[in-house]
């Protein structure tokens, strides 16, 4: 709810994401990562959890990040950059947990993600997207352990909130917060969003503004 957040953060977030956001880089391997510069915020999640849709909703651009009905299609780290004065990049990470992917492909994705997480000094936070209809799964808990080990700050975002009854969503948030108590790198607040309705986007933008302020 936006009435619990500093209105200045909400407005600054709105302005920043109303600016020019564009694709700048795709990295299929650790050797092809772009030079470090701006603060980076990454989005991780199971295949088809809605990472690309969320990035599009954040920036108000329907086709900035490619969406796909084919799980596991995103096989690279995709970098987007905002207006010059924003000092921020968004990173769309490969989806995980797609059972039909080959073992070699899964190993390749896993290596790329692990090396990126452990060696990126400009990475301020990873938003781990969880399908709000289903909550945390074992494969999600595995990536949380990876983030804990890498000592990378992360926060859970429940997606597709418009497809869940309010009472059920509240229970899911409570259960997720309880689960995060076991994870030292986790930010203890859970966000809920809907890329279709735009719910939760002002709060997510404001959270990113707060992160940028902390980095300056």
From Swiss-Prot:
Pfam hit, one: MMR_HSR1
Keyword Nucleotide-binding attached: yes
GO molecular-function terms, A-Z: GTP binding; metal ion binding
GO biological process, one term: division septum assembly
Keywords: Cell cycle, Cell division, GTP-binding, Magnesium, Metal-binding, Nucleotide-binding, Septation
GO cellular component terms, semicolon-separated: cytosol
Domain EngB-type G: 37-214
Binding site for Mg(2+): 52, 74
Binding residue positions for GTP: 45-52, 72-76, 92-95, 159-162, 193-195
Required cofactor(s): Mg(2+)
InterPro entries, sorted: G_ENGB_dom, GTP-bd, GTP-bd_ribosome_bio_YsxC, P-loop_NTPase
Cysteine pairs bridged by disulfides in the record: none
Lineage top rank: taxon: Bacteria
Biological function: Necessary for normal cell division and for the maintenance of normal septation.
UniProt-listed HAMAP family: GTPase_EngB (MF_00321)
Family assignment from sequence similarity: Belongs to the TRAFAC class TrmE-Era-EngA-EngB-Septin-like GTPase superfamily. EngB GTPase family.
Name of the protein this chain belongs to: Probable GTP-binding protein EngB
Source species of the chain: Rhodopseudomonas palustris (strain TIE-1)
The gene coding this protein: engB
């Amino acid at each position: 709810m936006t009435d619990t957040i500093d209105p200045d953060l909400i407005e600054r977030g709105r302005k920043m994401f109303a600016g020019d956001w564009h694709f700048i880089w795709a990295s299929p391997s650790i050797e092809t990562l772009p030079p470090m510069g701006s603060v980076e915020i990454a989005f991780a999640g199971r295949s088809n959890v809605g990472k690309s849709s969320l990035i599009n909703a954040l920036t108000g651009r329907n086709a900035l990040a490619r969406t796909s009905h084919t799980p596991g299609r995103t096989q690279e780290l995709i970098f987007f950059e905002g207006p010059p004065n924003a000092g921020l990049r968004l990173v769309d990470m490969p989806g995980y947990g797609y059972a039909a992917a080959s073992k070699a492909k899964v190993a390749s994705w896993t290596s790329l993600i692990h090396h990126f997480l452990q060696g990126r000094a400009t990475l301020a936070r990873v938003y781990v997207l969880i399908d709000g209809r289903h909550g945390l799964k074992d494969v999600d808990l595995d990536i949380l352990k990876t983030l804990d080990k890498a000592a990378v700050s992360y926060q859970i975002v429940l997606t597709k909130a418009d497809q869940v009854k309010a009472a059920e969503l509240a229970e899911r948030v409570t259960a997720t917060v309880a689960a995060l108590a076991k994870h030292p790198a986790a930010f203890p607040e859970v966000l809920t969003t809907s890329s279709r309705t735009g719910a939760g986007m002002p709060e997510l933008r404001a959270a990113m503004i707060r992160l940028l302020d902390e980095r300056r």
